Design a protein with these regions (language model features):
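N-terminal Sec-pathway targeting helices
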Residues: 1-17, 24
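Ligand-binding clefts/hinges and TM-proximal coupling segments of bilobed small-molecule sensing domains
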Residues: 25, 161-195, 276-312
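Short, glycine-/small- and polar/acidic-enriched structural segments
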Residues: 31-196, 202-203, 225-228, 250
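Secondary-structure end/capping motifs
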Residues: 44, 266-350
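Pocket-lining segment of extracytoplasmic ligand-binding domains
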Residues: 115, 197-200, 207-300
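Small-molecule pocket liners
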Residues: 134-146, 239-240, 252-256, 260-261, ...
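Periplasmic peptidoglycan-binding/tethering modules of Gram-negative envelope proteins
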Residues: 365-454, 525-526
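Periplasmic OmpA-like peptidoglycan-binding domain that tethers envelope proteins to the cell wall
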Residues: 460-526
């Protein structure tokens, strides 16, 4: 071989090697993970605002086994993230306080949790995305099988007093630091006949344990708060589902929280993470069967149980999440949730600036993608377009019921009236104080689903004067309340009912002015 050919051979070798390395790099960028070992190097939170580098960004997200978080655990979603140069590690951390501590200490970048836990635990971060609302997945179940007279919250006092007379106390069970506990707090603050202090509280690790305790004939459990698929099983076995998250569809909201560290060092990563997540959600909205299959596989559930779980979860699209963040809806939910926590001693102070707790900045790209998709499908599939826009279930009109239908509907319980619905002496004219009380009640009633909950306004008088006059006055007062609530925008089926002085408060004289009262009773209609 002549020495003249050696430089040419050497140059050819360099070109071949360069093409090989370049080809492998390009293949790895287009199809991450196709060639083992090439994508194994990760760098947590590299400096800069873009993931367009050869370093892969490693994100750690903390959550639990809730089916609403199954997308974050799915291989399909994690593979999609890798195409953006993001490697996601999902870890279960069931202790909510530890979950936030790890975020604050830099051991995690993101956390998924409920809005109430976000307010309670106060992480060093902000809400950057909304995941879902539970719409039936969580429920309060009464042990009607053991206590046949226990069919609504109105029956609690009698059952509790009977147990005490026999030297026993009744129990209540739920999974602590979960939506089940928050739903119990909602009962405690919203309904006058329910008081957590009346029960021996048994907090368990999982709803499956609460469900077992409710069924155990040797336990004196009167109430359990559980989630699907146990809610469906309880209903099928004759227990009373007195209130579910479907009745209060905005009470339990799951959120994505980004650490302040991630917000400051890698804002672009958050946008790309959310863009990939909501793209997956949009796909699931178009074809719900793949999400059901994902939930079944993730939770090792049967197809029917997975369907029950999915039926109770309403996932946010990016467009809807953005609308919540920018229209004031999320601010109102924060205020309402904080009020429940404060009233039950779980929060010392309601946030003064709730708008500072979240940002819509990082969801903008994902929302624009969803809006583009809505425009594309609107003409051919308006129902899908509505669902992608965040309407869907919410746009169904309220079914109008007759007075007799509302009156015959099974009771849930009486709302806690903070203040007095007062009238002029001997008249049906509301006082300013009475109007103020009703204005507060408008907000309370609007928390409940018009599709599943109706309202009975029941007027009572004290025993002074003739029965007929008192009957007429109580009916007139109840009707005035109904008219006032309707005038303030209440869309629920609502009816007025006068009782005169026929149902005095137990334990006080029928002539006592305290009998002059107005009950706001919620009943189940659907």
């Amino acid at each position: 071989m002549s020495k003249r050919t050696e430089p040419a051979l050497f140059l050819a070798f360099l070109i071949t090697a360069g093409l090989s390395v370049g080809g492998l790099w390009l293949l790895n960028r287009v199809s991450p993970g196709l060639i083992p070992g090439l994508s194994s190097q990760t760098a947590p939170l590299a400096d800069g605002n873009s993931t367009n580098s050869q370093q892969k960004i490693q994100l750690t997200i903390l959550g639990d086994t809730f089916s609403g978080y199954s997308t974050f655990r799915s291989a399909t979603f994690q593979d999609a993230l890798k195409e953006s140069g993001i490697s996601l590690r999902y870890e279960d951390e069931f202790d909510q306080a530890k979950r936030v501590t790890r975020l604050n200490q830099g051991q995690a970048d993101l956390v998924v949790t409920t809005l109430d836990q976000f307010l309670k635990q106060k992480p060093a971060g902000k809400i950057v995305g909304l995941i879902d609302r539970t719409v039936g997945a969580d429920a309060v179940v009464l042990n009607t099988r053991k206590y046949p007279s226990l069919k609504s919250l109105l029956d609690l006092n009698q059952v509790v007093n009977q147990a005490r007379a026999n030297g026993r106390s009744l129990g209540m069970t739920f999974a602590g630091d979960t939506p089940s506990e928050y739903l119990a707090l909602v009962l405690d603050t919203k309904f006058e006949a329910f008081n957590l202090q009346d029960f021996e509280i048994n907090k368990v690790e999982d709803a499956s344990e609460a469900w077992k305790q409710l069924q155990d004939p040797n336990q004196n459990v009167a109430i359990a708060v559980i989630w699907e698929p146990f809610v469906t099983q309880a209903r099928q076995q004759g227990y009373t589902v007195v209130l579910s998250s479907k009745d209060a569809p905005e009470a339990i909201v799951d959120v994505v929280i980004a650490s302040n560290r991630l917000l400051q060092s890698q804002p672009q990563v958050i946008s790309e993470f959310l863009e990939a997540y909501y793209r997956r959600i949009d796909s699931n909205v178009r074809d719900g069967s793949q999400l059901q299959a994902q939930i079944a596989e993730d939770g090792k559930l049967s197809a029917s149980d997975a369907a029950a779980v999915l039926q109770g979860i309403d996932f946010f699209t990016a467009a809807e999440a953005q609308e919540w963040m920018t229209s004031g809806t999320l601010t109102r939910r924060i205020n309402s949730t904080a009020a429940v926590l404060a009233l039950t001693g779980r929060l010392n102070q309601v946030p003064q600036k709730p708008e500072a707790l979240f940002t819509s900045q990082f969801i903008a790209r994902a929302a624009n993608n969803t809006k583009t998709l809505v425009d594309l499908v609107r003409a051919d599939n308006p129902a899908l377009a509505d669902r992608l826009s965040g309407k869907g279930r919410a746009i169904a009109p309220t079914q109008k019921l007759t007075v007799s239908q509302v009156k015959a509907a099974p009771a849930i319980g009486n709302l806690q009236v903070r203040g007095e619905v007062s009238f002029g002496v001997g008249s049906a004219d509301l006082t300013p104080a009475g109007e103020k009380t009703l204005n507060q009640l408008v907000q309370e009633i609007n928390e409940f689903n018009t599709q599943t909950v109706a309202v009975r306004v029941i007027g009572h008088t004290s025993r002074t004067g003739s029965a007929s006059i008192n009957q007429t006055l109580s009916q007139q007062r109840a009707q005035v309340v109904v008219n006032y609530l309707r005038g303030k925008g209440i869309q629920h089926n609502i009816m007025a009912e006068g009782k005169g002085f026929n149902e005095p408060i137990p334990g006080i004289s029928p002539e006592n002015p305290r009998n002059q009262r107005t009950e706001i009773r919620l009943v189940r209609i659907n």
